[in-house]
Design a protein with these regions (language model features):
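Basic, Lys/Arg-enriched alpha-helical interface segments
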Residues: 1-67, 76-80, 87-112
Length: 112
């Protein structure tokens, strides 16, 4: 049974602003997430630490010369809600994750 994946409305706006290469690479990873669901593990998916969201995950992929991370969480209906994404290449790892997690948490509160 395939899992469902959906964009938070703000993440959908972010997605259309990404380069075509990033959109294609992200879509390929999302198809894998739909097929496998929450058991998809490292190196493709890992749990983000330091979040108030239980089991906030990151989908990892490379595209357009960047090192991309997409934060998501499964809601009570078994839907993977895509919350926030960004390229962590050339950015302080601590600052990148602080920003990614804060954005994901803010959007998650408006989703529930």
């Amino acid at each position: 049974m395939p899992w469902h994946v959906t964009f938070h409305p703000e993440m959908a706006k972010d997605f259309v602003a990404f380069s075509r290469e990033v959109q294609i690479a992200m879509a390929a990873q999302l198809r894998l997430l739909e097929a496998v669901g929450p058991t998809l593990g490292r190196p493709t998916v890992d749990t983000l630490k330091g979040s108030r969201i239980a089991n906030l995950k990151e989908l990892r992929f490379a595209a357009d010369g960047g090192v991309w991370r997409l934060a998501f969480a499964f809601d009570g209906q078994r839907v993977a809600v895509l919350l926030a994404a960004g390229d962590k290449a050339g950015v302080s790892e601590a600052r990148f994750y602080r920003t990614l997690i804060a954005t994901a948490e803010k959007r998650w509160r408006t989703w529930e």
